């Protein structure tokens, strides 16, 4: 399974401006009470807005493979029982051969299990914005063609899609409202529109960063509205990050309130990456910080307050880069030492 590339993902602080627009939108949404699944219903077009997840299907196998290949390692049993048995998302990073094989595999396993796969798109032009070296050399045209291929591979399979971690988080650094900013917004909107039009059983969540203060919730809501977040397209918070549940919930709820009040979206939905947020506090250290612990296991919730799912979007034990508690582990590489540290 493709791993996230060896990049250092950084959550910086900088001043932000809020863009306020009021749109009119009326819809109706009903959630089932079965905790294993949820359905979205829109009064205008029920079939187009329904997603019955069934079980979440493991989509990233790095951890399972490590356990399989290290039967004599004293850490293997604990990693197997407390991490590997949970469904974890797969990351697609632009390697066409790996992406085709891996996406085909998770789609097949989801269909066979009657469940839902989890996929992260992480291939946006200028990914990581050069913080870890040269900018990601993908043009908007090449990116759109890649999105088309991924959409075709997914087809009618049931999928939770997380769209481009950090892309909106760094958008304002690309000369506010300038050409690069516009390209990024257009690329993300293309993902949203493509999967909304072609993949009826895919639920899309655009990454909305975390609660470190680098981007205000109100500014993030404005950015999410620009790329097409609506009642049928949600947002994801805390991806690959460590904000505790209370803190990240407050951040997500402020985004939700802004989307409702300023952009006329009656019931914005979101998911939370809880893979590494079991601590009650966080000092905003983003790169393999010591002392972190596992968070709440993945679960489909469908709460009335907008929370659809707790997910493990980054595999617990995956390195953020060669730093912190894993100075020798490249970004995206599974580190049994990091994984074991999370099991305290």
Which residues make up each language-model segment?
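Hydrophobic faces of well-ordered beta-strands that scaffold small-molecule active sites
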Residues: 53-61, 89-90, 115-119, 159-163, ...
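Actinobacteria-biased recognition of intrinsically disordered, low-complexity terminal regions
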Residues: 1-10, 44-49
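C-terminal region of N-terminal signal peptides and the immediate post-cleavage residues
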Residues: 26-48
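N-terminal carbohydrate-binding/catalytic regions of secreted carbohydrate-active enzymes
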Residues: 51-153, 315-319, 325-329, 333-334, ...
């Amino acid at each position: 399974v493709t791993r996230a590339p060896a990049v250092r993902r950084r959550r910086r602080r900088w001043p932000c401006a809020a863009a306020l627009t009021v749109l009119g939108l009326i819809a109706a949404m009903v959630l089932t009470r079965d905790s294993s699944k949820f359905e979205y219903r829109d009064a205008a077009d029920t079939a187009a807005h329904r997603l019955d997840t069934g079980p979440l299907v493991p989509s990233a196998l790095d951890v399972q493979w490590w356990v399989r290949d290290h039967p004599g390692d004293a850490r293997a049993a604990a990693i197997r029982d407390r991490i590997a048995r949970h469904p974890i998302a797969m990351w697609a990073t632009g390697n066409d051969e790996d992406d085709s094989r891996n996406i085909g595999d998770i789609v097949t396993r989801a269909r066979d299990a009657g469940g839902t796969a989890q996929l992260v798109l992480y291939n946006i032009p200028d990914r990581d914005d050069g913080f870890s070296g040269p900018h990601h050399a993908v043009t908007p045209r090449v990116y759109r063609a890649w999105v088309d291929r991924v959409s075709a591979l997914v087809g009618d399979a049931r999928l939770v899609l997380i769209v481009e971690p950090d892309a909106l988080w760094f958008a304002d650094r690309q000369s506010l409202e300038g050409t690069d900013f516009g390209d990024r917004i257009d690329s993300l909107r293309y993902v949203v529109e493509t999967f909304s039009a072609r993949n009826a059983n895919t639920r899309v969540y655009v990454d909305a960063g975390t609660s470190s203060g680098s981007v205000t919730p109100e500014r993030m809501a404005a950015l999410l509205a620009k790329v097409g977040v609506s009642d049928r397209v949600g947002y994801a918070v805390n991806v690959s990050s460590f904000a505790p549940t209370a803190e990240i919930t407050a951040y997500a709820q402020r985004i939700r309130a802004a989307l409702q009040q300023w952009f006329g979206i009656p019931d914005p939905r979101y998911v939370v990456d809880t893979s590494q947020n079991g601590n009650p506090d966080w000092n905003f250290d983003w790169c393999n910080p010591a002392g972190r612990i596992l968070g709440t296991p993945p679960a489909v919730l469908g709460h009335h307050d907008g929370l659809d799912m707790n997910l493990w979007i980054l595999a617990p034990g995956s390195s953020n880069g060669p730093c912190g508690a894993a100075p020798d582990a490249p970004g995206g590489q599974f580190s049994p030492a990091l994984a074991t540290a999370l099991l305290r």
